[in-house]
Amino acid sequence: MSAPTKPHARPQGAGNSVPNTVKPATQFPSKPAVAKLERVSPEQLTGAQSVIRSLEELDVEVIFGIPGGAVLLVYDPLFYSKKLRHVLVRHEQGAGHAASGYAHVTGKVGVCMATSGPGATNLVTPLADAQMDSVPVVAITGQVGRSLIGTDAFQEADISGITMPITKHNFLVRAGDDIPRVLAEAFHIASSGRPGAVLVDIPKDVLQGQCKFSWPPKMDLPGYKPNTKPHNRQIRAAAKLIADARKPVLYVGGGVIRGEATEQLRDLAELTGIPVVSTLMARGAFPDSHHQNLGMPGMHGTVAAVAALQRSDLLIALGTRFDDRVTGKLDSFAPDAKVIHADIDPAEIGKNRHADVPIVGDVKAVIVELIAMLRHYEVPGNIEMTDWWSYLDGVRKTYPLSYSPQSDGTLSPEYVIEKLGEIVGPEAVYVAGVGQHQMWAAQFISYEKPRTWLNSGGLGTMGFAIPAAMGAKIARPEAEVWAIDGDGCFQMTNQELATCAIEGAPIKVALINNGNLGMVRQWQALFYQERYSQTDLATHSHRIPDFVKLAEALGCVGLRCECEEDVVDVINQARAINNRPVVIDFIVGADAQVWPMVAAGASNDEIQAARGIRPLFDDESEGHV
């Protein structure tokens, strides 16, 4: 929804100019980006100064952006800010994804900024991406002057109209006095309830004119009241269903990470002994090393996780949205299961699957109250799941995640990613692009902690990895950050490696170079009789580009690995370099495919552990329960 700001006056003010000092994000106070309680007396400022002062009061640490005509006025007071670090990216898409990466690993609001017209429209994809994955991002864009809006002026684009369907909310500021209130509201909306993307569009003459500033402003959001407290009656009904279940599953989504509820999830799982499946966006919400973790469900999930959902009699869905990549053909998904669906967003409940017990509320509060109710009714220890666990353990043992070496002797991408996870370990942050490498990274790296796995789950945005990894590294400079990218994705946003080199963000890139648009090629092999139309990128046949030379040109160290014997050494070599970004060009086989797989639109009953092998529903010897 889009809202022009209201013209009523607000208290006002301006601060002293101080020289700009660039600092890593962690040197700034680690506080949520919300309005402070300390009152700032009214001052007279320009609109641009009001923007900078508001961001300072909101404890913003970093802004990712590019200056341009309509937003240039904001960059002048930014020059004097002692509190705000600005990262000059090479493309506005990089700014948006970097803001998302920052928000992913910190839980704070990520901030990006662009000028009007093409600058603003270049933010469309990252805003849609953040909104789909419930990532708190605020984008500030310049706009042509108010009198020019609607005249097709130079670099004019109706960015508030364009982004209306892909943001949680957006604003077109029409009065300078409204800037503090609007920015406070934008940060509140982005970070509360179900997090999401918010855009604030400010005309050039509003930035240029005089206005009043004071802090904190009084927010005016009468229609926005996220319900965070679950209803006790629904909690009681959920506890009753759990007590009666014999084949329950905890179906966990990214909302558990967004809601900081991973410890409570573990408490619930261990209290009840119920198996856990965690979606692509929830990797790390529950430790992979835990016996109750069956892995990731869905199109490329584990056989055990898919089996658990399909054979369950109760789905306890926490912070998840029953998206098509998990459910497969919806009318055949978990056919015998009742559903408890808890989510902060009431629009998600019942959207794709009927909920027998709907619970609207903050997922942490839901789990805490559910645990208390289960203990009250003495449910823990009384759920009979012996046969259920026997079945699931059998499936897990029979069909573990695995892969076969490449028949032509080329390097297996699965081996590369598996070794990377083993060597680097669970303390690192892993960021993936979209495609085969994304799925292998989700499958073959063990995630033990939340906010260590970043990817574009809902929108599936190629080019996400490099800028998002940059944002993560700037947010957490002490962390080892690996971008796992494909040669297709990498060529969309690799220019941000120059930003990384200049800004002191030494990320490491495992480039899974199979010479093709790998996932598209896999679908062509499986569903289009191997007609490989327009998927050969020539990065193998012509070495165009030469990724080692490209990395060096962008200020990075470039390495190459073509055989299994060198994988460990080259990873360790990259880890030893911490003063510059490092790119490892792993030349891998073109024919590797991601398995298990449920074909798009097919039932989860048709999962294949490998090509032509349907383990669950054809073989009666599996001991179905």
From Swiss-Prot:
**Which is one Gene Ontology cellular component term of this protein?**
acetolactate synthase complex
Pfam families per UniProt: TPP_enzyme_C, TPP_enzyme_M, TPP_enzyme_N
Could you say which enzyme class this protein belongs to? Answer: transferase
Which reaction equations make up its catalytic activity?
A: 2 pyruvate + H(+) = (2S)-2-acetolactate + CO2
Q: Where is this region: Disordered?
A: 1-29
Q: Which domain of life is it from?
A: Bacteria
According to the record, the residues making up region (Thiamine pyrophosphate binding) are 436-516
| GO BP term, example | L-valine biosynthetic process
Bias-annotated ranges (Polar residues):
14-29
Q: Is Metal-binding tagged as a keyword?
A: yes
Q: How is the cofactor bound?
A: Binds 1 Mg(2+) ion per subunit.
Q: Which residues bind FAD?
A: 194, 300-321, 343-362
Q: Where does Mg(2+) bind?
A: D487, N514
InterPro entries per the record?
Acetolactate_synth_lsu, AHAS_TPP, DHS-like_NAD/FAD-binding_dom, THDP-binding, Thiamin_PyroP_enz_cen_dom, Thiamin_PyroP_enz_TPP-bd_dom, TPP-bd_CS, TPP_enz
Annotated residues that bind thiamine diphosphate are located at E92
Q: Which cofactor does it need?
A: Mg(2+); thiamine diphosphate
Q: Does the keyword Amino-acid biosynthesis apply?
A: yes
Any idea which GO molecular function terms this record carries? acetolactate synthase activity; flavin adenine dinucleotide binding; magnesium ion binding; thiamine pyrophosphate binding
Pathway, per UniProt?
Amino-acid biosynthesis; L-isoleucine biosynthesis; L-isoleucine from 2-oxobutanoate: step 1/4; Amino-acid biosynthesis; L-valine biosynthesis; L-valine from pyruvate: step 1/4
- Name of the featured protein: Acetolactate synthase
Annotated organism of origin: Mycobacterium leprae (strain TN)
**Lineage, opening ranks:** Bacteria, Bacillati, Actinomycetota, Actinomycetes, Mycobacteriales
